[in-house]
Amino acid sequence: MLYAACGGTQRGISFNDLLCGLVLITRGTQAEKTKFLWNLYCNDAGTFIIKSDYVRNVNLAPFESVSLFAQSERVNFEQFQDWIIKHRNATVLSKWLLSDNCVSLTSELETPTFYQSLAGVTHLEEKDIGDLEKEFWRLKNTSQNGQIDLQFLGPLISPPIPKNALAGLFNAFDENRDGHIDFKELCCGVSAACRGPGVERTRFCFKIFDVDRDGVLSHDETLQMINVLLLVAKENQESQQYKDLTKQLVISDLLEFGQRRSPDGTPSKLTRDNVSLTAEDFMLWTVQCDLRLMQPLLDLIFELCHIVFGLWPQCKHMENDIVRGWLRREERRPYRVGQFWYLITHDWWLSWMQYTQHTTHTCDYCKRTASQRTAVDEALVCDESFNTHSLEQHDSYSLGSGTGSASGSGSASSGISAGRHCGPVRPGPIDNSNLITANPFRNVRTLTGEGGHLKRDTPLVQNHDFELVPKSLWKALNRWYGDNLPLPRQVIQPPNSDVELELYPLNLRILLHQAQPSQTGVGGGTQLGSWGSTVSGGYGVLASGGGYAAIAVSSVLQPPKRYLAYTAAFSRLATVRQVGEFLCEQLRLKSEDIRLWHVPQLDNGAILLEEDAMCLKELLIRDNDQLLLEIRNKDLTWPEELGSLATAQCGQGAGTPGDRRRLTRSSIMSVHAPGATGLHNLGNTCFMNAALQVLFNTQPLAQYFQREMHRFEVNAANKLGTKGQLAMRYAELLKEVWTATTRSVAPLKLRFCVNKYAPQFAGGGQHDSQELLEWLLDALHEDLNRVMEKPYSELKDSNGRPDKIVAAEAWSQHHARNQSIIIDLFYGQLKSKVSCLGCGHESVRFDPFSLLSLPLPVENYIYFEVLVILLDGSVPIKYGFRLNSDCKYSHLKHKLSTMCSLPPNLMLVCELWNSQIRQVLNDDEKLRTQSAKELYVYQLPEQSMRTRSNSGLSMHIEQGLKDIQRSSALITSAQDSLSSLSTLQTSSHRASSRVLCNGHVSGLDVEGEAEVGTDVSQCNSNSNYNPIVSTYSGNGSGDNQVHELLPDEAGKVSRCFGKRECMPHSLFCFKESLILSSSPENTFMHGAAAQQKRVSSAKLLHTESNTSSMSYTNHSGENSMESSLTEPIPLADLEPVSSRNGSGGEDCSYRTSPNDSSGLSTGHTLGASLDVDEQAEEGNAEDHDQPDQITTSQPETSSGVYSRRSSQPPHKAGKYLVAVHRKITRHDSYFLSYHKTRPSLFGVPLLIPNSEGGTHKDLYCAVWLQVSRLLSPLPATTEQANHAADCDDSLGYDFPFTLRAVKADGLTCAICPWSSFCRGCEIRCNNDYVLQGALPPINAAASNTSTPKMNAKFPSLPNLEAKRTPEYTASLSYTPTTKYFEDFTIAIDWDPTALHLRYQSTLERLWVDHETIAISRREQVEPVDLNHCLRAFTSEEKLEQWYHCSHCKGKKPATKKLQIWKLPPILIVHLKRFNCVNGKWVKSQKVVHFPFDDFDPTPYLASVPQETILRHKELLELKNDAEMTMATNEVVSELDEIDAPSKEVKEELPNQTGSTKATASPPPTGNILRQSKTKNAVRRQRLISTSLTKTPIVDGEFEDYHQHRLKPDVDQFDPRYRLYAVVSHSGMLNGGHYISYASNATGSWYCYNDSSCREISQKPVIDPSAAYLLFYERKGLDYEPYLPNIEGRTLPNTASVPLEVDETEGELKKLCSIS
């Protein structure tokens, strides 16, 4: 039977069937195995098991046979499933398959999975954890920041959780206080809140109200608790008993409880003004309180964990209570706008109610009443074996209503109703097909998840045709049963109406344009129609969608075709903007690349939806209407615009789509402003449209063409122009723009004219708008040049003549050849001065300009972010700085050294990849921009550094890891690393000082084998070090204590893991050793050393957080850190290694003389009898008089970081090893793999000091020092243990990891040959040496070098000496650093239990941002202003090539300086964002701020016009001050008497000020006057220039060098400009887009984006990083003088111009074709 069930036949069995059968037998779930047994015993139809056939094939006992076929001769699957679960031993196959240890191809307990580890320490089963994981990742993926934090979780659980309890509930889950809930915390919290015993559930509630986590509810916390409990209780369905309950009654009950708790009847300390509860009192009050206020909250949290977090109910009756309780609570709340409710057909709801309400006497949950549930442990499991397999299994088993109906009909035919006796059948997936109508567009993709069209022919009634459930409850039912057709509906609030549920949203058809056939023959319609995605949520909810293929543009204009692409449902209150944004997110489009059109059903035309803020109802869009989604082409053209052009030119119509405007209230009331008309994009012509729009809004030029004055000045004979074509086409387009009533026009004729006369702008590519503008102004000027015949002129050399004469001469010659309105408005004059550095000769030249091209500052800096990882295990710190791109990594080290005070030669700069050190960057390498923000710098150990150290945690390794992990220091540091990272930097100095003052002494810098004497004192009076004596006494418990497993604890072990003999040792120890004990004394030392209770201070070597380097004791000997020999070393054999410090003291660190090294196995230690106070006194009294005393060097502190004195010798880098984190996971393909497990790397590699003579235990201690912050600490006591934090008691006696020797890849062994398939030989935690002098010497010149090498001393690790020859060892001294990593690496193999339960992955890449990060980032993107660019433009620069000096008669070095001599009325500023760098054009994204009003370019004028303006302003201010002085002379008199400085100010004024003494006046006037006189007292320094000496500025004889036509009241010497237009370029160089902003004649600002034109605020927000062209107009400019006088003039003969028009029309018609 088994062979046949697996697919075997007489001809054999296929491999696929055999494999599936083995997987089912070994890995199948209980439900799958039950279904497998059903298929073995059922009939051929697979519907029933016949009693006669079953008894014949299976030898059943009478009892089992009667229990199975008691009601009928045949049973269905549901009946068989219930029976076989209860009688697993009924048959041989069921006993074999359904037992816990059935068949296993590999032992699951060799490497426990994450599920097994969590199941072992929580009240959850492995399947529960798997279900929670699915929901956890779904929630995490929907979060915006990828984390389940309070901001994300709040809207999901509140309501029903009260808002004032939201933070407390979140903190109860967030045990490590990192601000988000990880999966382990979720499982532990759900276990404690739902599956734990009543005591644990109550303790979880206590954590909700204990906000400060001090174990006591303060008065405020107690009042908050009462408010929450009352609010939840009154929302409960059984709220009658809580209806009249008030806050005062609860407080009274608490006071009575406190009185009962008082010993001997003494008065309670609790009062109404001071009500507080301890954790014990809280739990007793919840049990003894008659109010039972805690039960509603417990029920709410119980429901929350099932509904929101994804926990499955343990039985169907529990499911009924959860669903009904959640639904009743939600129904009592009013509708909220935006809330989604889901429709469920009433038939399915009834079947579910019957299934879940059916109770039996066998279910323990059903036997409990509401009053009993508070006293009975709610973690009991229903004996009915509620089927909780996945939704996919439901489908594969073909269960549901169909099976139930078949069973009923069969039973009815035999006269026995099986359904009546076995109970209702589990309902199948939710099927709402009877609520909706048939979809006529079944083959069209739906973008929204509305589910379908509800029936309208028959009215649907709630509670009769359908039921409504909230979104959260629907998701839970969907997880448990599945669904075929969700029907979400949204709550809306129409204007002037109440909220309502919108059952019938608008179902719209979305049309797209059919792609024009390309050369490949693939149309866009097929591609768009083939998109597929899974839609989740309701209509309007985001869903994943495909991309969009850009529509190709045919070279022949023709109307685009439309086709039905999608359907979507939207609320009738949705706005056009919301619809557009939804479609963009669904189809991955940009909002600026789409437009929406309404296509009426009986009309082929389209109406553009311009009103973004109007809703669909206001736009008269009805159900089943059509919306056209227009997608802009790749060349930035709009298909509808091109189609309208084709239609118009072919005679089919004369209007554009924009002509049709919907007559809405806003469109009727709005007036189409003149000039507010867009321009069609004719194929990447945005550069032309933007330039034209700003010229159209240049008011004097616009008036010139609007009045048709150009027709009197067209110069068709000018060969340098376009024969008047451009001027005529430009005028026609300008007139059309300013008089059009349509929203956009097509600049076709002007485009053809530009292509003809400027072929460089032809084609479909993108061009530079500035280049077009410059050509356009020049071509318009030539077409309108009033000079018919240009005279010949030759520009003379300045030859030392005054600038005024040379400039007038140059402008006169230019004006004689060029006279037009373009010259009058846009042209100015630049002064160019070249100074010879050899003789000082100056050559001045004046040239006209139409726009100023200002180069942007190009900074050749690279921004670096470097993460510094220290050896002390502190939180890494990230630094930021900027370096020149030509620098090397040696400069980076020195720059970083100034920030973190870490010596450059103690830095290892490297790049990480895949949790490994990919490459070490040498000092002489040039900086790379690719890894600028991903650099890691490790602190290298000093040559004398020891490894077992951590003063911050006071780590005494002999004390045992259990007590270390429970120490308050570790708990505090672990919490502070998450909750106080923002203050870590500022408090680092205080922490360093505090630790240094605790009396810890660092080790001594000693080389060789030596012994340190006990009489040690300090020789530096300023030293903070005081030697201490650390003692430790064990409690003697050790291994002598044997704890008996309690009965309930044994049941927990049996429930979680089955039989004990199958459990792994570590997990069994955790389950059995539940009572904490201290570690045995000999855990980390040998027996002889264990008898010694005193521990020397020199054994415990400390480093401080953020320490750059310290002096460490260098040990050697058999037991380097456990040696207790006390024979002193002669002080004469020590050599001083540190010089005198600046305070007069001396750092007397000594080293042993190399000549005295005898190679003896001797240790050294400090005496254990020194007193701290005596040592301090001796150090202060005998500072300089004890030359034979030994002390440690004291590093100075600065902001918590040690800084070295300049007098100290350079630090020498020591040897080190690289360690990588590794976890062992079960191999997925265990059938084919040689190994059952596979290693994988994770986290950030470590750098482990490996000094000479170090032991394996030193390696373990050094690793523990750096990884201890990544583990969640064990609670200090068992009373403080949380629900699942104390994961494994066995970890207290050992490190939670194992070190192994591997290769650089971290996966294979570095010792064994590849054929052994070894994953790395274990490095045991003992006192064997790691190194024995086999390493080559460290190259002093290289700072990033190390040569790790291991010499094994135990049999399990072979000796590495056989692999190394002397030649090979010597060569390693000169091998690059990366070579060393290829030989030997340490793999940190984490214990699976510790990795799963205590390792905090969020801390792996946690760092603290140094203040330099913000400073450097700000400097990197620091903006500049327009003045900065103008200063750079007018500053003097040295010429790269030598200049031919006319005076020296040869080439000489020279400088050049540009300045503005004459300002134009319209000043165009060009910001040069496009530059050629190394042969490639790049765009600068530099932020340039520019003024809108009162832009004064005076500082950038040449000296003569600049001094003229400044002197005029100065005299004007003096005149104003004099007038004010005359009016308030009395005030001046009083001020002179009071304030002496005012007298000095008055004496310095010139005589023409006319200041006299005056009487007193009110104080405000006197203050203003005094400030004004003080300001003017400091006379302006007049400009000094050779030009001013030749052209002096005479007061009263000022000359206006700009000659602007201004209005009468405007000062001609106040050249202030206002911004009226901007051209912006967004995107990259080759694929960007131009838009323009302009202010029209009324002062309103408009944004012109091709055919789109919209009004914006008065001062538009323009991206300063995209501004490209700035247009300024002189304030007070009078337009009339610039316009020619045409009175009495006749039009010239322009007969030749219309001929060109006909030619243009002909070219245009060639593009039209009728398809």
From Swiss-Prot:
Span of domain EF-hand: 161-196, 197-232
Composition bias, Acidic residues: 1171-1180
Catalytic residues, chain numbering: 686 (nucleophile), 1633 (proton acceptor)
Catalyzed reactions: Thiol-dependent hydrolysis of ester, thioester, amide, peptide and isopeptide bonds formed by the C-terminal Gly of ubiquitin (a 76-residue protein attached to proteins as an intracellular targeting signal)
Binding-site residues, Ca(2+) 2: 210, 212, 214, 221
Gene Ontology process terms (BP): protein deubiquitination; proteolysis
A Gene Ontology term for the protein's cellular component: Golgi apparatus
Keyword presence, Protease: yes
Biased composition (Low complexity): 408-419
Stretches assigned to the DUSP domain: 314-492
Disruption of the gene: reported phenotype: RNAi-mediated knockdown has no effect on the number of mitochondrial clumps and mitochondrial membrane potential in the indirect flight muscles, and there is also no effect on climbing performance. However RNAi-mediated knockdown rescues the defective mitophagy phenotypes caused by mutations in park; reducing the number of mitochondrial clumps, and improving mitochondrial membrane potential and climbing performance in park-deficient flies.
Residue ranges of domain USP in the record: 677-1675
GO MF terms held by the record: calcium ion binding; cysteine-type deubiquitinase activity
Entry-linked InterPro entries: DUSP-like_sf, EF-hand-dom_pair, EF_Hand_1_Ca_BS, EF_hand_dom, Papain-like_cys_pep_sf, Pept_C19_DUSP, Peptidase_C19_UCH, Ub_carboxyl-term_hydrolase
Location of the region described as Disordered in the Swiss-Prot/TrEMBL record: 393-429, 1103-1213, 1536-1569
Biased composition (Basic and acidic residues): 1540-1549
Family label: Belongs to the peptidase C19 family. USP20/USP33 subfamily.
Cited PANTHER family: UBIQUITIN CARBOXYL-TERMINAL HYDROLASE (PTHR21646), UBIQUITIN CARBOXYL-TERMINAL HYDROLASE 32 (PTHR21646:SF76)
Function, as annotated: Deubiquitinating enzyme that acts as an inhibitor of mitophagy probably by counteracting the action of park. Possibly functions by hydrolyzing ubiquitin attached by park on target proteins, thereby reducing park's ability to drive mitophagy.
Name this protein carries in UniProt: Ubiquitin carboxyl-terminal hydrolase 32
